[in-house]
Design a protein with these regions (language model features):
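Conserved acidic donor-binding segment of nucleotide-sugar-dependent glycosyltransferases
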Residues: 303, 317-328, 337-343
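A short, histidine- and acid-enriched strand-loop-helix "catalytic/donor-clamping" loop
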Residues: 97, 111-129, 141-144
Length: 395
């Protein structure tokens, strides 16, 4: 008998679409039907979907959002869809009101309920004690866990939670595709990109790639790069956008000769700018952008910020990236050191290449697939296999 697995998401990120599509195809031979339930407006933003996305994979469900000060809550009407599912995977979040309904309904519907998430809120500035306490309590009651990587898995184990019910996903993007795009950029294209930005051929380039908000430490970035440029004729290329863009817009206006904001870029267009870069600067809140840097063989320089996501666990100091204290002086010195030291930078680039071949989308799909198999085979948490089998026979 075929099994049905639901993934419930209150957002649909562009970089996740290839993952869901490949996971659905991998499930075909396992007798598993995958459905990803998302808000209609989130799905509409990505139309038309890529050809590789199977028909019916993404299902729009009614969604309501509530704002209470800085707190945003989401409710998705998925009750009956879950009733016929064998496994429901939801975000580990106290702000997803749907989760509470799913916890209540599984008492008599007996679908397995799994969390997919970080383990806790890694951004200290956004962490609330009541929210984290509630999240911790719920995290110990799901039937299975899909942890972003080993950092998240360690947090979940310490809740405590049974290690045999945790799948370490190794959160990633399509690194193979990103590397293919990066490798396809010709020297002529790179030279033309330099010319279009007014960057001399012998001037080093550092790139920032990510969103613009407080935890990204944009003020810190501006001051550090300004300090580093006193000893290096470097140029800063900024890829991204967000609510904190005023800081960088003003910075570019004052330093138009060497600061270049190019906006949000994707795919091969983004790879084109990384081809210029000697270093990737992300002083605060490192997330999946570290995987971009690895795929593009561009060593990441960051700090010991308390706002990093679990993906910071992919960084190996002195092997594939570099981390300093949260000091503008230390960070600026590290920029200068790594731009001057070609041997160290070359070694870090090799480490990036090695890591990029391990943290791949294909591996993430296979890990998630194996995790779903395990979750479907295990009885619900706290229920014996015999009792679970007896319940299933009655349905």
């Amino acid at each position: 008998m075929r099994k049905t697995v639901l993934i419930v998401k209150s957002a649909l990120e562009q970089f996740r679409i290839p993952f869901y599509s490949r996971l659905a195809k991998a499930f075909e031979s396992d007798g598993v039907d995958l459905r990803v339930l998302v808000p209609p407006d989130a799905l509409a933003k990505h139309q038309p979907l890529p050809e590789e996305s199977p028909a019916g994979l993404f299902v729009p469900v009614g969604t309501r959002r509530f704002q209470f000060g800085a707190r945003r809550l989401t409710y998705q009407r998925i009750g009956r869809s879950a009733d016929s599912a064998d496994l429901v995977i939801v975000q580990q979040s106290a702000a997803e009101l749907t989760n509470y309904l799913l916890f209540a309904r599984r008492t008599w519907k007996r679908y397995r309920l799994a969390f997919w998430g970080h383990g806790h809120n890694f951004q200290e500035s956004l962490r609330s004690r009541p929210g984290e306490c509630l999240k911790k309590s719920l995290s110990k009651r799901v039937d299975y866990w899909f942890a972003y990587n080993h950092v998240s898995a360690d947090i979940v184990r310490r809740l405590p939670y049974p290690a045999e019910r945790i799948c370490v996903v190794n959160n990633s993007i399509d690194t193979e595709g990103a590397r293919a795009q990066w490798n396809s950029i010709t020297p002529q294209e790179t030279a033309e990109t330099r010319r279009s930005l007014g960057i001399p051929a012998d001037h080093p380039v550092v790139v920032y790639c990510g969103a613009f908000y407080k935890a990204k430490m944009l003020d810190f970035l501006v001051e550090s790069v300004t300090r580093a440029r006193r000893t290096q004729p470097l140029h800063l290329v900024v890829i991204g956008d967000g609510p904190g863009n005023r800081i960088l817009l003003d910075f570019e206006k004052q330093n138009a000769e060497w600061v270049h904001l190019v906006g949000a870029r994707y795919g091969r267009d983004k790879a084109r700018y990384f081809r210029l870069a000697n270093l990737c600067l992300l002083p605060g809140a490192v997330g999946l952008a570290i995987v971009d840097a690895m795929a593009y063989e561009t060593p990441l320089l960051t700090t010991r910020s308390r706002d990093h996501g679990p993906e910071i666990g992919y960084l190996e100091q002195g092997e594939n990236g570099w981390m300093t204290d949260c000091s503008i002086e230390d960070y600026a010195d590290a920029i200068g050191l790594l731009l001057r030291d070609h041997d160290t930078r070359g070694r870090l680039a090799q480490g990036c290449r090695r890591t990029a071949t391990q943290i791949t989308l294909a591996n993430m799909v296979e890990r998630f697939r194996q995790g779903v198999r395990s979750a479907l085979q295990m009885p619900p948490l706290g229920i014996s296999a015999e009792a679970d089998a007896a319940f299933c026979e009655q349905q």
